[in-house]
Each structure stands twice: as C-alpha cells, then as structure tokens.
Amino acid sequence: MSEQNNTEMTFQIQRIYTKDISFEAPNAPHVFQKDWQPEVKLDLDTASTQLADDVYEVVLRVTVTASLGEETAFLCEVQQGGIFSIAGIEGTQMAHCLGAYCPNILFPYARECITSMVSRGTFPQLNLAPVNFDALFMNYLQQQAGEGTEEHQDA
C-alpha cells in the first residue's frame, strides 16, 4: 500500500479567538423609548486561509442588524476565528470542512459574543437560532455548479 492510502484524517482545534468585534447603537438613546418590535437581519460569511502545511485559519463573520422601521436600533458584528490542524482530506471534503464543519464549531462562540454585546447595549435579549452550515455549504456548491453550467452554455 502506498503512504497516501494509509493517511488518516486528522482534525484538531488549535485555537478559537475573537478576531474583531463591533457594536453600534446609532439612534440611542431615543430608540429605547420606542415600542420594541425590531426587524432583525442576520448575515453570515466565512473565509479560510492556509497558514502552514495542514494548518488553516477559518474566520466566521456574523453581522446582526436590528431595525425599528427605517431606524437602525443596533448593528453588531463579530469575526470569530479559529486555527485548525486538518490533514488527510482534500478537494470537496476539505472545502466542506473549512466551509461548514469549522464554522459550525465557531458559531456558538460568535453567538455568545453577540448576545453579550446586545445585552451590554441594554437592548432586550437576542437569541440567535442555530445555523445549518452544511445546508448553506450545499447551497453554495449548487450555486457554483449552476454558474459553471451557465458559463458553458454561453461559450
């Protein structure tokens, strides 16, 4: 057997850290006197960078915007980072690991940070629902495949 066939998949968390946080309440204090029926918008984004052989940084960016009508009550952004050792996988499996599995690990940390900042801003508690990063990753792959098909049709 070749050495490649004996390569076992390994995954290890080296570090989880807060890379950047931001909280803005541009319409405070008068926003506190309004009836609290916000429209809450959640945006997610991930990025990964190879730091060394089998070592990757994954950053999950979570942005929450709460609006009352046309006014922004608060805007909260967290970039939660992680450094992971990943070996023994390639291609689509590696893309899935970096684009779904690692963000799944990082999300609870980002959610806790956002909840804390919103609370410190004296807004009512914000509970973010769990996110299915596997489904988001599959949607991303389908979009990429669709764009590739369209490019071939245009050629």
Curated annotation (Swiss-Prot):
<dbReference type="InterPro" id="IPR035958">
    <property type="entry name" value="SecB-like_sf"/>
</dbReference>
<keyword id="KW-0963">Cytoplasm</keyword>
<dbReference type="GO" id="GO:0015031">
    <property type="term" value="P:protein transport"/>
</dbReference>
<keyword id="KW-0143">Chaperone</keyword>
<protein>
    <recommendedName>
        <fullName>Protein-export protein SecB</fullName>
    </recommendedName>
</protein>
<dbReference type="GO" id="GO:0051262">
    <property type="term" value="P:protein tetramerization"/>
</dbReference>
<dbReference type="GO" id="GO:0051082">
    <property type="term" value="F:unfolded protein binding"/>
</dbReference>
<keyword id="KW-0813">Transport</keyword>
<keyword id="KW-0653">Protein transport</keyword>
<dbReference type="GO" id="GO:0006457">
    <property type="term" value="P:protein folding"/>
</dbReference>
<keyword id="KW-0811">Translocation</keyword>
<dbReference type="GO" id="GO:0005737">
    <property type="term" value="C:cytoplasm"/>
</dbReference>
<dbReference type="InterPro" id="IPR003708">
    <property type="entry name" value="SecB"/>
</dbReference>
<comment type="function">
    <text>One of the proteins required for the normal export of preproteins out of the cell cytoplasm. It is a molecular chaperone that binds to a subset of precursor proteins, maintaining them in a translocation-competent state. It also specifically binds to its receptor SecA.</text>
</comment>
<dbReference type="Pfam" id="PF02556">
    <property type="entry name" value="SecB"/>
</dbReference>
<comment type="similarity">
    <text>Belongs to the SecB family.</text>
</comment>
<comment type="subunit">
    <text>Homotetramer, a dimer of dimers. One homotetramer interacts with 1 SecA dimer.</text>
</comment>
